[in-house]
Amino acid sequence: MRGLLRRLRGVPELKTRRLRLVAMTPEMLEADAAREGRLTTLLKARVPAAWPPAEWELHVLATIFANATAKPESMGWHRYTLMPDRLGRRTLVGCVGGFPRGDGVVEIGYSTLPAFQRKGYGTEAAGALVEYLLEQEGVRAVTAQTFASMAESIKVMERCGMVFAGEGDDPGTVRYRRER
């Protein structure tokens, strides 16, 4: 665990024009799962009552935690999306993350709370993560999947430079991909 925490200190906060993407630490993931309010302190951000997004189930947190401890090279692949206001106060608006699929391919997922959707935050956060991942040693492509009926999610992938790559893993899903 000590090595994991040392590695996290070297993971930079990703910054976009409007957002800050903070690497998820084991402590943050535990606080998030506990739903007791400690996440606000750890992120130094307001956590809306609507947190977490519908897709953000406890087994997802457990998987991210296990992945981070088993594969320290993936530190920084999972991030909370924070939006600072004009005074620098931050609000948690979503999350983005990536899982190695093997052979240099990382699959990303992203979610934005409903109150912050349709403002470009998901695209901005996913785009920053895609760029970050493609700079990492050993990563040759980034993919994402969604249901074919989810036009907004497909737009996010396309705006991140991904192109249609065929059917996804589950029935009714499609996969998009961006090569290095």
Where does each model-flagged region fall?
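GNAT-family acyltransferases
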Residues: 1-107, 111-115, 128-136, 145-149, ...
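Conserved active-site alpha-helix within GNAT-family acetyltransferase domains
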Residues: 119, 123, 149-166
